[in-house]
């Protein structure tokens, strides 16, 4: 069981360390349905959530927005008909920080109660 979903983000400065090669496999095991993507040499966490229609996808997007605002850490969100792609990375350090794993786990928690999930 992941404890990341109960953790809170810490302020991430430009000089904060990225997740180490040793930490990465430990953290990713706690969010097994997320993929690591590399774009422009920047590692990111990404997951696609499927919904029955656009209304449910948009409601989920807004719910993720609420937890993001509360933690002061914001994802890339692509909302389409029946689908939301959520991408987490730390802009200030151009890579992955523990905050990204926390927010991925918290996104999964929001998804558990999201209406209209497929």
Curated annotation (Swiss-Prot):
In the record, the note on similarity to other proteins reads:
Belongs to the pterin-4-alpha-carbinolamine dehydratase family.
Q: What is its EC number?
A: 4.2.1.96
Q: Which UniProt keywords apply?
A: Lyase
Name the NCBIfam families on file.
PRK00823.1-1
User: Which chemical reaction does it catalyze?
Assistant: (4aS,6R)-4a-hydroxy-L-erythro-5,6,7,8-tetrahydrobiopterin = (6R)-L-erythro-6,7-dihydrobiopterin + H2O
What species does this protein belong to?
A: Pseudomonas fluorescens (strain Pf0-1)
Q: Which Pfam families match?
A: Pterin_4a
Care to name a GO molecular-function term for this sequence? Answer: 4-alpha-hydroxytetrahydrobiopterin dehydratase activity
Its GO biological process annotations read: tetrahydrobiopterin biosynthetic process
Q: Please identify the protein, giving its name as recorded.
A: Putative pterin-4-alpha-carbinolamine dehydratase
Under SUPFAM superfamilies, the record lists: PCD-like
